[in-house]
Regions:
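Single-residue signature of alpha-solenoid repeat helices
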Residues: 59-62, 115, 122, 168, ...
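Short coil/linker segments at helix-helix boundaries
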Residues: 49-53, 61, 89-166, 195, ...
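Canonical tetratricopeptide repeat
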Residues: 83, 90, 154, 188, ...
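Residue-level recognition of tetratricopeptide repeat
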Residues: 44, 49-51, 86-93, 157, ...
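TPR alpha-solenoid repeat register
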Residues: 80, 138-139, 185, 219-220, ...
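Hydrophobic/aromatic packing residues within the alpha-helices of TPR/SEL1-like helical repeat arrays
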Residues: 63, 67-70, 119, 126, ...
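Short coil turns that delineate tetratricopeptide repeat
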Residues: 74-75, 134, 180, 214, ...
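Structural motif corresponding to the intra-repeat A-B loop/turn of tetratricopeptide repeats
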Residues: 91, 162, 196, 237, ...
Length: 496
């Protein structure tokens, strides 16, 4: 008998980034085109028409007029470059706009066949404005983060999530040309470098992401993601090392996990962090400190989710801290009365602690929700074995022995074994997956009906899966999806 928990596949992706409309761009202390006259005033008028046309039609002719007018003189370079930068951005916002075009395409008559990198040109123009008028940095930043930047950044994120590393790198770097202050592109480049096994480059990009994110709450998600990736990379280095190098790498990986856990807001990833940090302590030769990983959870379990509490309980069990494990599993069960992992592990821990009367009601509940799993019957057998060892009363020993044999045989002779390997719960969806093993001697097709439960045990959805035909001594798989969210557990009737 052992305490178990389902494994976690920890996956992270950056969410899409949004941007404010052109009409929302303003800064009370900045007006680079105030009190202009002549060509600049005319260019400003053409820019207003271009902005209006960009929302309803084609602004190209107005943009070409802006470029012609701002190039027709050298006075007031701040105003000219502000209008020039705006024009580059609006041009890039048009459908099928290319990042590099010939000057003639923009209506420029001087050297018309020469090319212009519009991202670099916009950056150069806005940089001149920012240097001359620092108070305009806010409004130029809003222009820098318009649709061209957004498209490059979200394109980089899409490419990264699709495993297209070259495209992800190119697009992320393109977005940095326009805006080097947001953390998203650095995070993408860090992930690209990590997947290319370039740990040094990945760490450099992740540090830049953290610096860019700072303490701004708008960047909290990317900051948390980056801290997780830094910590995961540390565990990977420790796992790949041996001997003294492994101990040193594991010791170094502990602090990054602590940093991540301090801000973690995802129960699944926090559970993964608990597993990793505790493992790093063990690999570093400091098993005594493992309890520090979950000590805050025992002190205030209501701050944590059931999954992280269960994982912490497993960590406590593996390191011989049974009393801590009981508290953690009990806290998890208080949060979710239908958590199979919490029920199973709490029952197993009670048995290990010779608290058999507390184990039996939990085993009863486990069998009621998961009746076709032979492992559950073995918990009865282990409990009766413990009771047998704890008494010298011959009559009781006979009763306990008979019960042990009964439940052991019941487990061994079950014709089918159903194992749930995935239970994914989302606000608007629930997914269950697993296997059905045919322990019989003839092929068979199985039908299993799952009831999805809320926290009170009320059925919120019923889903049926058919598996088979399954050959003798082989297994078939099932996967069901419910459109109902808010699930806490499941149950099914015995599979025959």
């Amino acid at each position: 008998m052992r305490v178990t928990v389902n494994s976690i596949a920890a996956a992270l992706s950056i969410g899409f980034v949004a941007v404010s409309p052109l009409s929302a761009q303003n800064a009370t202390n900045c007006d680079p085109t105030a009190n202009t006259k002549g060509d600049i005033a005319k260019a400003q008028f053409s820019m207003a028409r271009a902005i209006s046309a960009s929302e309803k039609g084609n602004p190209t002719r107005d943009l070409q007029e802006v470029f012609r007018l701002v190039d027709n003189g050298n006075d007031n370079p701040t105003a000219r470059n502000f209008l020039r930068g705006q024009a580059y951005i609006i041009y890039l916002m048009q459908p099928n706009a290319q990042p590099v075009v010939q000057r003639g395409t923009l209506g420029m008559t001087t050297n018309p066949t020469a090319t212009v990198d519009l991202y670099a040109a916009a950056d150069s123009a806005f940089s001149i404005v920012e240097k001359a008028s620092p108070e305009c940095a806010t409004v130029t930043s809003q222009w820098r983060q318009q649709k061209p930047w957004l498209n490059a950044l979200n394109g980089a994120i899409n490419a990264l999530n699709a495993g297209q590393l070259d495209s992800a790198e190119m697009l992320a770097k393109r977005s940095l040309v326009l805006d080097r202050h947001a953390p998203y592109a650095y995070s993408v480049l860090g992930s690209v470098a990590q997947q290319r096994k370039n740990s040094a480059a990945a760490m450099d990009y992740w540090k830049q992401a953290l610096t860019a994110a700072g303490t701004d709450t708008i960047y909290a998600d990317v900051r948390t993601k980056t801290l997780y990736e830094i910590a995961s990379a540390g565990s990977d280095r420790a796992d790949a090392a041996t001997g003294a190098a492994k101990r040193a790498a594991a010791k170094e990986a502990i602090k990054p996990w602590q940093d991540y856990m301090a801000v973690a807001n995802n129960d699944l990833l926090l559970a993964d962090a608990i597993d990793n940090e505790s493992r790093m302590y063990v690999d570093a030769g400091d098993s005594v400190s493992v309890s520090s990983v979950y000590a805050p959870m025992i002190a205030n379990p209501s701050k944590y989710g059931e999954i992280s509490l269960v994982h912490a309980g497993v960590v406590a069990t593996r390191n011989g801290h049974q009393a801590d494990a009981l508290k953690l599993f009990d806290a998890a069960l208080a949060q979710n009365p239908y958590s199979r992992d919490a029920i199973n592990n709490l029952a197993a821990t009670y048995i290990q602690n010779n608290q058999f009367p507390k184990a039996f009601p939990l085993i009863d509940k486990l069998v009621s929700i998961d009746p076709s799993n032979p492992d559950n019957q073995l918990l009865y057998a282990f409990a009766y074995q413990g009771l047998y060892k704890g008494t010298k009363d011959k009559k009781l020993q006979k009763i306990y022995t008979d019960s042990l044999v009964y439940f052991n045989n019941k487990s061994e002779n079950m014709p089918v074994k159903l194992s749930v390997t995935e239970f994914t719960r989302r606000p608007d969806q629930t997914m269950l997956a697993g296997t059905i093993e045919n322990r019989g001697t003839t092929p068979k097709t199985y039908s299993v009906s799952f009831e999805i439960l809320d926290k009170s045990g009320t059925v919120i959805s019923t889903e049926t899966a058919s598996v088979g035909p399954v050959a003798p001594k082989k297994s078939g798989t099932f996967r069901i999806t419910s459109a109902k969210g808010g699930a806490y557990g499941y149950r099914y009737k015995p599979v025959t």
